[in-house]
């Protein structure tokens, strides 16, 4: 009997020891790189132009999901980054876009505005106050009792702050007016190593000498069809009158600036230097220059990917040299949208037209006055959304549900409108895959009372924001790539959800997932 018990104990000990040996260690560092407007099809299309250290290394050594998808529509930088690091949609995390209408003041606010905190090296007052749930960085700080090193570095303010979350030790972005790395007093005292970088190596000392031209011979750039015949291109950033820093942030050199500050961070902080896991959230840019179309800048977008390939290679080498890629879990993904191309030339006879949201609001108000009497029933409008005057409706003791239904039925009769969804229909109505995506974009406290879905090919003219957008619902492929820390190399084309990133990383760091991240972690990623 004793021998049997002893044998069982030895067997249990051996099995436990083997499991401990085969369980991958917690990564010393996690690096998340979100590349604005990165496209899987462009990565593949321009592959003949790449070296061996960037995309090709990712394809050889990484686990590559070629079709990663967001569970909501109207994606932009803010909503995408918030979704990645919270593991949920705008319906829960509160970040419905870069900007939205504030119901109380009827003014447009930006996703990271907060007058309660002062900017550092910037006049912009910033915090993540609009982010309503926890992020991956928040959960790491809680799990390590604040001992983890968590920093966020990005060309743009919203990408830096929303990736940093509420509890990071710092979020840094390039100032649109000075080129200095900026921050917010929300994150406490501004690090001395960033101040030193600004004083000694700041972009403002070098930008006048930077010129963006083709990295390769111009005959190499033949992978984007365009009517515009480009012989070459040349962009400099020396003219003070042309918002040079904003344009710089849409060039590939912005990615190199991120790498420079990452190098300083790894040199002057404790990131990756002890057994407490740390987190760096980074952002790059991969859209077209000055947010113009590929038709205008076909050569630039190809050169952008060539230089992006170099920047990724430099970053991988930097992490490998300073921390060790085997000690690092590195993931790369995209914001999943692209800047909208202009209206198609009329000669091709593609159906379309113009939908004016201001006219829509005015006509709707006239219609409601004809039924319910005088009054300003439409309070305002913004980004294909109508905001009704709830106080007036309450004062008149009218039925809100009836007004919402009448309004939706009226708007859907307008030219160019495919559907009109009331807030009640989105919250309480029947489920369809399309309604689910729209609902995930919607937030009851921020969004309008009626969401208008405009036909593809039509231009939405928003007089309030002075922006005209062509509606295009075509699929845009976005990648999700893992590399380092025992990652199993494989290329997969099965669609995966971006919402799985936060729970997957949390699983491998052995911490809680963010508090609204309900998706299960991806499996089979590590050896």
Regions from the PLM with identified roles:
Residues 1-26:
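Bacterial Sec-dependent N-terminal signal peptides
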Residues 26-31, 61-66, 92, 145-150, ...:
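Loop/turn elements at helix/coil->beta-strand transitions in domains of secreted/extracellular proteins
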Residues 27-39, 58, 84, 140, ...:
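Beta-strand elements within well-structured catalytic alpha/beta cores of enzymes
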Residues 39-45, 68-71, 121-128, 245-252, ...:
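Second-shell loop/turn segments in exported
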Residues 43-92, 149-153:
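Short, structured active-site-proximal loop/turn typified by the sulfatase FGly-forming signature C/S-X-P-X-R
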Residues 67, 76, 98-123, 133, ...:
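Secreted, luminal/periplasmic, and some membrane-associated catalytic domains
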Residues 89, 97-276, 285-292, 413-415, ...:
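His/Asp/Glu-rich, glycine-adjacent segments
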Residues 359-398, 467-509, 523-527:
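Substrate-binding rim/cap in mid-to-C-terminal beta-strand-loop elements of soluble/periplasmic
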């Amino acid at each position: 009997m004793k021998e049997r018990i002893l044998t069982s104990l030895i067997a249990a000990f051996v099995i436990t020891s083997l499991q401990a040996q085969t369980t991958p260690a917690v990564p010393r560092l996690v690096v998340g790189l979100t590349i604005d407007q990165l496209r899987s099809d462009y990565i593949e299309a321009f592959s003949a132009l790449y070296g061996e250290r960037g995309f090709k290394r990712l394809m050889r050594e990484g686990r590559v999901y070629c079709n990663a998808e967001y569970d909501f529509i109207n994606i932009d930088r803010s909503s995408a980054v918030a979704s990645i690091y919270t593991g949920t949609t705008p319906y829960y995390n509160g970040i419905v876009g870069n900007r939205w209408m504030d119901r109380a003041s009827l003014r447009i606010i930006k996703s990271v505005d907060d007058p309660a905190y002062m900017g550092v090296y910037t006049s912009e007052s910033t915090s993540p106050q609009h982010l309503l749930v926890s992020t991956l960085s928040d959960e790491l700080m809680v799990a390590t009792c604040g001992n983890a090193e968590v920093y966020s570095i990005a060309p743009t303010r919203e990408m830096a702050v929303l990736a940093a979350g509420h509890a990071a030790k710092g979020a840094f972005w390039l100032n649109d007016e000075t080129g200095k790395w900026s921050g917010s007093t929300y994150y406490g005292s501004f690090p001395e190593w960033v101040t030193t970088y600004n004083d000694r190596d700041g972009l403002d000392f070098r930008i006048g000498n930077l010129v963006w031209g083709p990295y390769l011979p111009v005959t190499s750039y033949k992978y984007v069809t365009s009517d515009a015949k480009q012989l070459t291109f040349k962009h400099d950033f020396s003219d003070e009158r042309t918002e040079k820093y904003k344009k710089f942030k849409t060039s590939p050199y912005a990615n190199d600036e991120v790498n420079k500050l990452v190098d300083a961070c790894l040199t002057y902080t404790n990131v990756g230097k002890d057994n407490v896991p740390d987190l760096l959230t980074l952002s790059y840019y991969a859209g077209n220059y000055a947010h113009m179309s590929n038709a205008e800048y076909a050569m630039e977008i190809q050169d952008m990917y060539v230089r992006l390939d170099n920047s990724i290679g430099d970053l991988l080498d930097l992490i490998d040299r300073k921390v060790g890629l085997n000690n690092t879990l590195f993931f790369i993904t995209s914001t999943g949208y692209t800047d909208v191309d202009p209206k198609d030339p009329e000669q091709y006879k593609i159906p379309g037209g113009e939908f004016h949201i201001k006219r829509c609001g005015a006509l709707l108000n006239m219609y409601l006055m004809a039924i319910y009497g005088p009054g300003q029933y439409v309070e305002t409008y913004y980004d294909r959304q109508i905001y009704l005057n709830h106080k007036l409706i309450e004062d008149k003791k009218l039925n809100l549900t009836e007004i919402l239904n009448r309004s939706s039925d009226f708007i859907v009769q307008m030219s160019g409108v495919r559907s009109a969804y009331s807030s009640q229909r989105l919250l309480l109505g029947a489920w369809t895959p399309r309604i689910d995506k729209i609902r995930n974009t919607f937030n009851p406290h921020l969004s309008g009372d009626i969401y208008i879905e405009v036909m593809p090919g039509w231009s939405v003219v928003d007089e309030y924001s002075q922006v005209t957008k062509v509606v295009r619902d075509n699929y845009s492929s976005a990648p999700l790539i893992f590399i380092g820390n025992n990652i199993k190399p494989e290329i997969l084309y099965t669609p995966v959800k971006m919402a799985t990133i936060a729970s997957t990383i949390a699983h491998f760091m052995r911490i809680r997932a963010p508090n609204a991240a309900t998706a299960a972690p991806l499996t089979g990623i590590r050896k």
